[in-house]
Amino acid sequence: MKPVKHLLTTSNKSANVPALTTKKGLHNLPLSPELKEKHNAKLIHDKIEPMVLRSPPTGESILRYALPIPSSKTKNLLPEDEMIGKIIKHLKMVVSTLEETYGHCDQNGEEPFVKHEHEELSLSVGDDMNSFLTYCSQFAAQLEEALKEEQNILESLFKWFQWQVNQMEEISKDQTLLQAEPPKPDKTVILNIAEIVRLVQRFEELKNRLKQRSKSSVKVMLSKTMDKENRPEAVKSCEALAQKIEEFLEAHSTDEFKDVSATEPQTAHSMTNRFNAMLKVFENQANMLERAVNDQVLLDAEYKQMQCDFQLLSEEKLVLENELQKLKDKEKTKPTNNRTKKAVKTVKKKDKGKSEDSEKKMSPEKEFKIKEDLDQVQKVARLEIENKVLQEQLKQALQEAEKAKHQLNYFLNQEKLLKSEGKTETTMQVGNSQTKVKGEDSKNIPLEKETRKSLVSDSGGQRTSDKIQEYPQITAQSGRLIEKSSEKKRSSPAISDLSQILKSQDESAFLESSNEVSVAENQSYKSPSETHDKSLTTVSSSKEVQDSLSVGTLAQKNETVISPFILPPVLTESKKADVSEEQLQKMTEEQTYQAAEKSQADSEVPDENLMVENKDSVTKVQIEQMKQRTSSMERHEETLTTPQLPEDMVLVSRIQSETKNLKATRNESFHSHNDVPEENLMLEQDTKSKTEVEVKKQKSFQDNQLSTHNEVPNERLVVEHQESLSKTKLQIKKQETSTEQPLTTPDKEPNENLILRHQDSMSKSEMQVKEQRTLKGQRIITHDEEPGKNLVLEHQDSVSKLEMQIEKTKKLPREKRHSTHDEESGENPMLKHQDSVSKIQVQLEIQETSEGEGRSIPDKNSMFVHQDSVSKLQMQEKKKITPGRERRNTRIVVPNENVISVHQDSKSKLQMQEKKQINSGVERHKTFPLEIKKKDISLEHLLPEEKVLLSRSESQTKKLQAKVTSRKIKNEAASELPDTAENLPAMYPSISDLIIQFDLNKVVETDIESLRGALGRRLLNDEFKTQSKSFPGPDIEQLTDAFGRDILKDEFKTRSKSLPETDERLHSTTERGTINDAIKTQLKRKSYPETVLKHLKGVNGKDIIKHLINIQSKSHGETDKEHLADDTGRGIIKGSINAQLKGHQKTDKNFFAYATGRGLMKESTTTQLKSHPETDKEFLADAIGRGIIIGPITTQLKSHRETDKELLKDAIGRDIIKGPISAQLKSHQETDVEPLTNAIGSSKTIGEIKTQLRTHYDVNLFKNKDMSVQRQEGIFTRSITPSKFPTKVINLSPFENKEETYEYSSPYVTAPSKAIYRTYRAGPSFSKDIHLPLLNQLPSGHSKVVTLSQKTIEFTLPTVTNTVGKPTYKVLHAAARKSVPHPYF
């Protein structure tokens, strides 16, 4: 260190006290004589209070005469002699001004004169002057004493300044010795010195040679000169070589080699080191070369592998191109549909995945070529798949053509039957329907082909043109044109399908109510022939609509579609139905009452369910005749005999063969289109019949007559294994409700939502027949048309259906108005995997439960998953008998509409349906859950008729369950939606196609984790929250770092749930040049209640560092938490924090929060906490400002034994050094809190303070607090202000005193302090030694004794007492003094 720094620090340390004393003495004399009198009263207690005199003028205030402390700049500029001269001159000026102000002190020179004047006045005034004179005399004596005291003080200060000058000289000498350590040599200097040494050596050699050269021989001289010239060349070459070596090492070696080459001289040893370094460099380069060679070999192998792969791909490409060419030739003549595009899209995805995998392996040079090849391969694969799809479509087209033939034959037979009945009106209507059907069939079939061709022509394979062609308008009897709305193009139909399906889940409650809306609005009915014609138009067009996955044209009002794959979609107008529910209910009740009177119990054709798939024309005619006749038992008997006809059996065999062929072609994805092969032959993903859409839109026109066409709920059905049965049923039901008179008792489309996933939908002709079943005047002419269409009962006993129908018609109470129209029992759809008995039961139950009111059958949403139909029958029969038998217009309308056999047994769902119908009171608008588990019902509850049916249906259910389980396994494997597959009914293997169509393979449910980071202009907020629920460890740690403009804020919050629960919080704020570090640690204990608190605050002027440490320990000695936050200013770096937590189980916690400022560094902090017996905590926080260094802080906590840990680390700044602070806390003994406030100015130094428990008074430990006079300098600051302090004893001794012993006793210190002995010599003999008191700031109320033992005392300055009762202490720590135990770094 420089001597100037130590001079400043020592002057700071010791000069403050005399400066303050002088200030107090000088300032109190003129301004407050009362205070002066009090100071004198301390020695002379009998003196009377002195007279008050006027204060000196403000312009001559004593502050003007304060001695300025020379700053560092002035000390650097002025020599010591000039500085001493200035101080002496200033002191003389102060003395002269004081004499002028208060008078001269020569033996009361002025005061007797003052007394004389007062005496003269006393003669005139009288006795009062006597007292005044006495006061004047006393004041004169006091003034003389004060002047003497001031003179002594000034003289002592003058001598002290002289001594201080000598002291500075000694310190400067000592510092020069201590600073003799050479600084780190500069490399350039060392190299220059070495070069100079070499040149000097060469010069000496040349000089010697010249001296030894012979003068006589010139030749010898010439030869020597030649040698001299050659040698420098050799030296130059060596130097050049050495320079090259150094350059090589600098370029390739590490710092170690650079240092060696730079610092060491060019000796043999250094050269060997350099060569070794070069060898290491070469070795490293050789290793790198070897690694590069190995990498090259690996890359070559990979390249060869990629070439092989490329060749294989090229060969495959050629093969695929050939196949592509073949497919292109075939593609021109074959139609296509949306399924081809979707299949192509899935292949494209697979090919893309393959291409990505292959591209990763390929080198970047060939990626472009490979991409092109892969695109071609993908095209080939697409075309190949399209070829297969087209082949399947050809087969489907043939089957559809065959269906069309059957339909034509059926309609012709139906027309003949109607004419034979003699009913001209119905005959005319049927004729119109036939013509319309034929015309539309002829129109729709070419349209279908055109759409397929147009879709095939779409080379991109993208489903961009998923639209349904607009179809010709159909004129209704009302005269309005019903336009078939063209569906919009959709880039991703899967998204729209999914969105509608999701909406359908929310609006499932509106399904049944929506059906009633159409019934309420049907004020006038349409003739059955009209509705029949409209429904017939849906036959041919439905195929095309089903092929296209158009989702946009959902049922417009009353239709709810349950997709077989997901959930029932939302009907667009279902909300409107809810508004008019109550009105509809009232209207339907009135209508049912009227209808009951006019309707007859036409138990119509129970045998229709026994009809075969290929709709025998004979059976159709019989059904029509039976429905057109009055309800008579003779017709029932005739119809009962119909299923036994040989023609029906032939048709059954034909249908079975057709279904087998269809299954083979569709990979079991198409479940035999046995149901209505003439109409429905629905594709796996056939969505809906276009004619159904037309029927719905026709129904929307509600002029006078809202003919309630149960508007094809399958309109939106993307039905893989489903056919349009429910659509026709819905239409029939709504048309039945429309009667001439208000007899609209519609069992309103209970099964509107029913989607027969694995069931062939009822024939659309059945829908038409049902629609035509509207009551005309006296009776309901229900054209049970084409019962055979629906009668494909693969796994059903047709006999059981008839029995169930007959039994339930008998069971139904035929009391008042109980006209149960067992209408179209034959219309029950052929449920491939469902018992037909359950269908009939569902129909009977639903129709019976509607008590005179249009009770919508709640089976709309019911989907029966592997449920026994027997239990359903039981529930149905029970609930049919139980409801009140009044005014029952229960029309068994389309009983099979309610059955959605998606591998479900209809038993439990019927039970649920019947229960909800009975409990719902009048409305019963309750939608059932999609999947209801089996509810086994014992045979005890079965009626005798049901037991018979049970025995018959057991075989069917067993077969059904076997197939269901096998297909269920396939479908589960095919399903790529793990989240929804569990809640959905099982599906056939064609589910993969559905997934491909909807792009559902892309749908993956992911967990979203939200992460937030806020980045301002220069602000970064990071929040970490860690929670550990283990027994001993911490629970929550939260870190929030905020970076301001030049500010770093750290906040740590840790919470522990272990036994020693701790809580710790820190908050710190940083300003322009200020560092506030607040550390608060709270340790909660269970055994020992008292706490230990240590509080430290450091305050600095311009560069202030504040440390706030609050440590509270409440447990047995186990501290579980440490919290630290350091705020760093402009140029400060915060170090890491290490915390080790040890509880019942050892847990180590290491946390590093490291921030970097401009170029300064902060030390790390380490805390070690141990469990029950001892707790060791070491805390070190170093903050470095511009010129300030704060030393480490060490805290050691010991529970049972008294130990002390001392940490001596000093950091040195420009002018200021703050020493370490060490505190020792004892657990079982009474602890004490000592707040230390350290004020650091521009030239102040804070030393090291050791504090212990107040219980130990016998030991004195006050290290580095030797406030010796030798280390004090600089009394005065620039502006001297009055301050208050207690002084015990001031001993002024001559400088000849060789040794001084300083002892500081305090109740806080328990260890003996090391006595500091030093001998000081002073030049002049008249100099005196003044010992000024230490100003230690401690809590008020604690006294401090300072004993300065001196051999001789010339005189004692009078002590000045403070006006404040309690003494206040101010600790001015000076740490940079040259103390013996202080090491220098």
Swiss-Prot record:
Coiled coil: 299-330, 374-411
Pfam families linked: BioT2 (PF15368)
Regions of compositional bias (Polar residues) in chain numbering: 425-436, 493-503, 511-528, 536-545, 654-664, 701-711
Keywords of the record: Coiled coil
UniProt region (Disordered), positions on chain: 329-364, 422-545, 572-752, 809-834
Keyword Cell cycle among UniProt keywords: no
Annotated disulfide bonds: none
This protein's record includes keyword Coiled coil: yes
Matching InterPro entries: CCDC7
Lineage top rank: taxon: Eukaryota
Annotated tissue distribution: Expressed in epithelium of normal cervix and cervical cancer. Overexpressed in early and interim cervical cancer.
Biased composition (Basic residues): 339-352
Biased composition, class Basic and acidic residues, residue ranges: 353-364, 437-455, 481-490, 573-589, 665-676, 685-697, 712-726
Annotated function: May play a role in tumorigenesis.
Protein name: Coiled-coil domain-containing protein 7
Organism: Homo sapiens (Human)
Primary gene name: CCDC7
